């Protein structure tokens, strides 16, 4: 109920809706802090911004299926957001798995999305390239393949206008836009068409090996 109240409030107050999510797949690190958490908190304090921040715990299942790790990582990530100054009274802060409508929308979007669109996703293609020609899909789960689709549901569920992303996520935003445009063509102007925002100075944060 609170999410739809905020949706209409944002619409009538002519605010820009900005959505940011972080996958709780381990302990928070400097990349999370500098690339997503601090910029999102700063932006949420602006008067013309309706900020949506969430823990993408379903996405974390792609890399591991340990419920204890997912739970503890979610708590640690939430604590990191709050300790860095997130004001939950001015921001919609939620856990992905608490919003069942996201998975419902994920299914609906999957029914209008062609497989070829997801075949071109960089994460999937990179995983295939690492395998042999005889077994191109070895150890690749459907979660990885459908990752851009669930990300689309995350974004379109709340009609985000702006989605801050790293350079590696720009293609996923383009996929989201394609899906939203196709849905709107068939069913009317249901979804906003989101735009990616990339900070050129934070596109890549090099690790201690100088690579990643």
Question: Can you name each region flagged by the protein language model?
Answer:
Residues 125-212:
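Active-site cores that bind ATP or allylic diphosphates and position pyrophosphate for catalysis
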Residues 14-153:
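N-terminal Rossmann-like or analogous alpha/beta NTP/dinucleotide-binding catalytic cores
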Residues 1-25, 44-48, 79, 87-93, ...:
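Non-catalytic terminal extensions that flank enzyme cores
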Residues 7-12, 61, 158, 172, ...:
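A generic signature of intrinsically disordered, low-complexity regions enriched in glycine/proline
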């Amino acid at each position: 109920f609170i999410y739809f109240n905020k949706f209409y409030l944002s619409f009538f107050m002519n605010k820009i809706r900005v959505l940011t999510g972080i996958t709780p797949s381990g302990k928070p690190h400097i990349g999370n802090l500098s690339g997503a958490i601090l910029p999102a908190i700063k932006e949420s304090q602006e008067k013309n911004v309706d900020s949506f921040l969430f823990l993408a715990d379903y996405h974390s299942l792609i890399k591991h299926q340990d419920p204890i790790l997912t739970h503890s990582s979610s708590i640690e990530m939430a604590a990191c957001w709050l300790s860095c100054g997130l004001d939950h009274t001015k921001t919609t802060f939620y856990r992905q798995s608490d919003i069942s409508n996201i998975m419902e929308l994920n299914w609906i979007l999957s029914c209008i999305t062609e497989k070829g669109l997801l075949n071109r996703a960089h994460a999937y293609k990179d995983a295939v390239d690492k395998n042999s020609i005889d077994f191109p899909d070895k150890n690749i789960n459907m979660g990885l393949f459908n990752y851009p689709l669930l990300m689309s549901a995350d974004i379109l569920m709340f009609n985000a206008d702006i989605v801050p992303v790293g350079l590696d996520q720009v293609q996923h935003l383009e996929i989201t836009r394609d899906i939203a445009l196709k849905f709107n063509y068939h069913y009317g102007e249901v979804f906003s068409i989101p735009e990616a925002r990339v900070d050129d100075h934070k596109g890549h944060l090099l690790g201690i090996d100088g690579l990643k």
